[in-house]
C-alpha cells in the first residue's frame, strides 16, 4: 500500500507486486509552525491536543519549524456564470474572471460567497427566454456574468441580434429582413473580452462569445484564461461557439468550458459546469441553444489557517495539491466563509 512502506507480494507463475512507498510523519507542539520547501507533497494536521503533525508522502525537499505565525493572505479565483447561446445566433460570452491576492481580510469575520448560474438557452420560438449568466462574488470581489448570444431579430420584433454585454460579451446573431448581421457584445475590462460579430454571406456564421483570455474570432469562441491556483494549470471562462445558418461546421467553444455551436436544426452544447464557459449558439430552424456553465470560487490560504463555510454552499477542500496551502473550491450556492487559525 502506498505511503505505508509495506512489502510487495511474491508470485508463483505470475508477476510479483511492488512494495508500497514510504512516508515521513513529524509531530511537534502546536506553538510551532512548519516551513515546507518545494519539491515535496505534504499536509499539516492540527490534533487539537497541544500538538500538530506534518505528513510527507512524496518527493524531496526541506522542513523546518518556526514560532512566527505567517501572514494571513487569501489567493482567490472568482468566475461568474457563462451566458446562454443565441437561437439562430451567437455563442454566449464567458463569465467574468478575477484573480489575485487579498491581505486585508480579518480572521473570525464572515465574508459572502455567491456562485453565479449559467445563462439559459432556448429554441428559436422561445428565444425571449435566453439569458446572460449571473455574477459570482467573494467578499467585495464580483465577477460579472457572461453576455447572452445575439438571437435572430427581424423587422417585426422579437429578439435582438446584438450580443449582450457581460464579463465577456456574447456573439452576434442574424438580422432577418433587416440586412446585415448583429455585432458582438463588449466584455468588462479586466474580466473578459468581446464577442465577435456575425458574418454576412450566403451561409452566415454567427459570432462566437468572448473568452477571459481573448476575444472571439468569427464563429469560434474566445479562449479562456489559464490559472494554477489549484496547483494544476487549468483553463476557465471560454466563450461559446456561434451557430451556422445552414449545414456545415459551426463555431467551436473556447478552451475553458465554452460550448460548441450547431448548424441548422441542431442542438448546441452547454458551457462546462464550474468553468463559466459560454453556451453554444444554434443555426437556422428550431434547434435549441445551450446554457452557459456555472461559475466557481476557489480560495487558497496558508495551511496554518483554516476556513469554515456556512450551509448553502457546496465546497471541496484539498490540503495536498499545493505544498503549505489549503485550497477550497466552492461550486454552488450562496453563503459565507470564516477564516481562523488551524
Predicted stretch roles:
Residues 1-342:
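Low-complexity, glycine/proline-biased repetitive segments and flexible coils/loops
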Amino acid at each position: 500500500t502506498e505511503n505505508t512502506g509495506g512489502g510487495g507480494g511474491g508470485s508463483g507463475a505470475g508477476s510479483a507486486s511492488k512494495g508500497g512507498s514510504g512516508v515521513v510523519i513529524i509531530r511537534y507542539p502546536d506553538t510551532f509552525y512548519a516551513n515546507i520547501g518545494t519539491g515535496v507533497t505534504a499536509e499539516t494536521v492540527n490534533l487539537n491536543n497541544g500538538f500538530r503533525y506534518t505528513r510527507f508522502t512524496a518527493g524531496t525537499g526541506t522542513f523546518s519549524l518556526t514560532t512566527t505565525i505567517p501572514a494571513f493572505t487569501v489567493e482567490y479565483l472568482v468566475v461568474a456564470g457563462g451566458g446562454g447561446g443565441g437561437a439562430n445566433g451567437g455563442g454566449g460570452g464567458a463569465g467574468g474572471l478575477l484573480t489575485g491576492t487579498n491581505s486585508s481580510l480579518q480572521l473570525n469575520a464572515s465574508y459572502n460567497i455567491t456562485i453565479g448560474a449559467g445563462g439559459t438557452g432556448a429554441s428559436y420560438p422561445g428565444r425571449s427566454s435566453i439569458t446572460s449568466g449571473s455574477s459570482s462574488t467573494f467578499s467585495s470581489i464580483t465577477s460579472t456574468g457572461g453576455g447572452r448570444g445575439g438571437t435572430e431579430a427581424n423587422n417585426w420584433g422579437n429578439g435582438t441580434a446584438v450580443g449582450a454585454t457581460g464579463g465577456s460579451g456574447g456573439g452576434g446573431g442574424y438580422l432577418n429582413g433587416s440586412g446585415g448581421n448583429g455585432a458582438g457584445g463588449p466584455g468588462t475590462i479586466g474580466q473578459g473580452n468581446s464577442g465577435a460579430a456575425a458574418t454576412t454571406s450566403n451561409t452566415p456564421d454567427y459570432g462566437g462569445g468572448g473568452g477571459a483570455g481573448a476575444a472571439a474570432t468569427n464563429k469560434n469562441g474566445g479562449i479562456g484564461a489559464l490559472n494554477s491556483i489549484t496547483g494544476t494549470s487549468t483553463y476557465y471562462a471560454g466563450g461559446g461557439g456561434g451557430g451556422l445558418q445552414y449545414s456545415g461546421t459551426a463555431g467551436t467553444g473556447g478552451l475553458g468550458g465554452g460550448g460548441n455551436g450547431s448548424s441548422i436544426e441542431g442542438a448546441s452544447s452547454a458551457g462546462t459546469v464550474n468553468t463559466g464557459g459560454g453556451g453554444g449558439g444554434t443555426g437556422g430552424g428550431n434547434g435549441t441553444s445551450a446554457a452557459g456553465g456555472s461559475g466557481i470560487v476557489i480560495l487558497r490560504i496558508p495551511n496554518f489557517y483554516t476556513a469554515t463555510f456556512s450551509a448553502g454552499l457546496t465546497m471541496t477542500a484539498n490540503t495536498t495539491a499545493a505544498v503549505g496551502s489549503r485550497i477550497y473550491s466552492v461550486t454552488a450556492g450562496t453563503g459565507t466563509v470564516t477564516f481562523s487559525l488551524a
